[in-house]
Structures are given as C-alpha cells and as structure tokens.
Amino acid sequence: MSLTSSSSVRVEWIAAVTIAAGTAAIGYLAYKRFYVKDHRNKAMINLHIQKDNPKIVHAFDMEDLGDKAVYCRCWRSKKFPFCDGAHTKHNEETGDNVGPLIIKKKET
C-alpha cells in the first residue's frame, strides 16, 4: 500500500466521520426540539393566587350560589375565584379564547 492510497483512505475516513457527526448532531437537536417535552410549563397560568398551596380548589354549596354565579378560568381576576372580566385583556394580549365559567339555576 503506497503513501498516496493510505492518505486517500484517511481523508475519506475523516470526511465520513465528519458527515456522520454532523448528521448525528442535527438529529439530536431535532429530537430535543420536537420530542423531548419540558415537564415544567414555561407559560404559567396562575401567576399570583395562593402560590403556597400545591393545588387550589374552591368548593361552593349549590344553595349558596343564588340564581347565577360567574367564576374565573384565566386566573387573572382581582376577585378570584369570581370573574371580573380580566380574561378580555388576557385574550387580547395572548390570542387566547378563555372565558368565565357561568353557573345558573335552570329555569323551571
């Protein structure tokens, strides 16, 4: 085997390894971007309400509701858990379409 053919094989080997490494890097970055999900939601919904609780739950007796009750679902209301219309500004800023939860007695 001459020096020229050995050198040629080495150049081909380096080129093949470079292409394989580049392809592997692009594949890894694509995998991380599209398939690996971060378990923490980067756009938190609840920004300031009862942050010391692991889960926020509000329960109401049906008898206490009266004829109609309107509850916040965007977590932006100053009267939380009741809706004050803050979702309108939230929807304009984010392009979201969230609205309140409205509970009313059935007409008999």
Swiss-Prot record:
Q: What is this protein called?
A: CDGSH iron-sulfur domain-containing protein 1
Q: Which cofactor does it need?
A: [2Fe-2S] cluster; pyridoxal 5'-phosphate
Enzyme nomenclature, EC number: 2.6.1.3
Give cross-link positions for Glycyl lysine isopeptide (Lys-Gly) (interchain with G-Cter in ubiquitin).
42, 55, 68, 78-79, 89, 104-106
Record annotation: effect of changing residue 74 to S:
Abolishes absorption in the 300-500 nm range
Tissue specificity field: Expression is reduced in cells derived from cystic fibrosis patients.
| Consequence when changing residue 55 to I | Fully incorporates and stabilizes the [2Fe-2S] cluster upon in vitro reconstitution. Abolishes alkaline pH dependence of the midpoint redox potential of the [2Fe-2S] cluster
Query: In its keyword annotation, does this UniProt entry include Cell membrane?
Result: no
Summarize the record's induction comment: Expression is down-regulated by glibenclamide and 5-[(4-carboxyphenyl)methylene]-2-thioxo-3-(3-trifluoromethyl)phenyl-4-thiazolidinone (CFTR(inh)172), and up-regulated by cAMP/isoproterenol/IBMX, components that inhibit and stimulate chloride transport activity respectively.
Q: SMART domains under this entry?
A: ZnF_CDGSH
Membrane-spanning intervals of the chain: 14-31
Report the leader peptide range. Answer: none
UniProt-listed Pfam families: MitoNEET_N (PF10660), zf-CDGSH (PF09360)
- Gene (UniProt): CISD1
* Modification note: Ubiquitinated by PRKN during mitophagy, leading to its degradation and enhancement of mitophagy. Deubiquitinated by USP30.
- Domain of life per record: Eukaryota
N6-acetyllysine: modified positions: 55, 68, 104
Q: Reproduce the miscellaneous comment text.
A: Binds pioglitazone, an anti-diabetes drug. Binding increases the stability of the 2Fe-2S cluster.
Biological function: L-cysteine transaminase that catalyzes the reversible transfer of the amino group from L-cysteine to the alpha-keto acid 2-oxoglutarate to respectively form 2-oxo-3-sulfanylpropanoate and L-glutamate. The catalytic cycle occurs in the presence of pyridoxal 5'-phosphate (PLP) cofactor that facilitates transamination by initially forming an internal aldimine with the epsilon-amino group of active site Lys-55 residue on the enzyme (PLP-enzyme aldimine), subsequently displaced by formation of an external aldimine with the substrate amino group (PLP-L-cysteine aldimine).
